[in-house]
UniProtKB/Swiss-Prot annotation:
PANTHER family recorded: 3-ISOPROPYLMALATE DEHYDRATASE SMALL SUBUNIT, 3-ISOPROPYLMALATE DEHYDRATASE SMALL SUBUNIT 2-RELATED-RELATED
Name of the protein in question: 3-isopropylmalate dehydratase small subunit
Keyword Lyase: yes
Record GO terms (molecular function): 3-isopropylmalate dehydratase activity
The UniProt record lists the keyword Lyase: yes
């Protein structure tokens, strides 16, 4: 997972509230067995609207999504985060997030910042006035900026640290690799343990 300190790019105003994970990526796409390639599934039902942002040239290559309250509610599905990430988004700002979605985002390298509803309206107004406007989301300073506009956002310290360091669950575990190895060597030999992978298995 790549570390995140600052995200700068085209901002998208998603003027919808209560966007659940099924709207972000419908269930029929959950049958895929890879963790990438979900950009075509993002907001699949809404793509049929010619006015929706994915069909607007001004928002091509967007990296910052500014959504209404209660974004990412509903069932837990990492695919929602993968779809946003694969499309190109690196940060999402909203007054409220679904707790599970927010947790999944931090583990998958997607910054989710909590901003007030008034500040969301201010960001939307700026993007409406200039479609394709660049926004900067600064994780170090915890502020989002556009020309002439600065708004603060909240993010818990643990998730902020993981994003700044670029630590997914595997990388986080490997930080303690020496301690894990020491524990395994001291553990009684009669206890269950994971056997080393056979060379033939590694070749397949």
């Amino acid at each position: 997972m790549e570390p995140i300190t600052r995200v700068t790019g085209t901002g998208v105003p998603l003027k919808r509230s209560n966007v659940d994970t099924d709207q972000i990526v419908p269930s029929q796409f959950l049958k895929r067995v890879t963790k990438t390639g979900f950009e075509d599934a993002l907001f699949f039902q809404w793509r049929k609207d010619p006015a929706f942002f994915v069909n607007q040239p001004a928002y091509e290559g967007a990296t910052v999504l500014v959504a209404g309250p209660d974004f990412g509610t509903g069932s837990s599905r990492e695919h929602a985060v993968w779809a946003l990430r694969d499309y190109g988004f690196r940060a999402v700002l909203s007054p409220r997030f679904g707790d599970i979605f927010r947790g999944n985002s931090g583990k998958q390298g997607l910054l989710t910042g909590i901003v007030t509803e008034d500040d969301v309206e201010r960001l939307w107004a700026a993007m409406d006035a200039e479609p394709g406007l660049d926004l900067t989301v600064d994780l170090v300073e915890r502020i989002a900026t556009a020309p002439g506009l600065t708004v603060p956002f909240e993010i818990d310290e643990y998730t902020r640290w993981r994003l700044l360091e670029g630590l997914d669950d595997i990388a986080l575990t490997l930080r303690d690799e020496d301690a894990i190895t020491t524990f395994e060597h001291r553990r009684a030999s009669w206890r269950p343990r994971t056997l080393p992978a056979r060379p033939a298995a590694l070749e397949n």
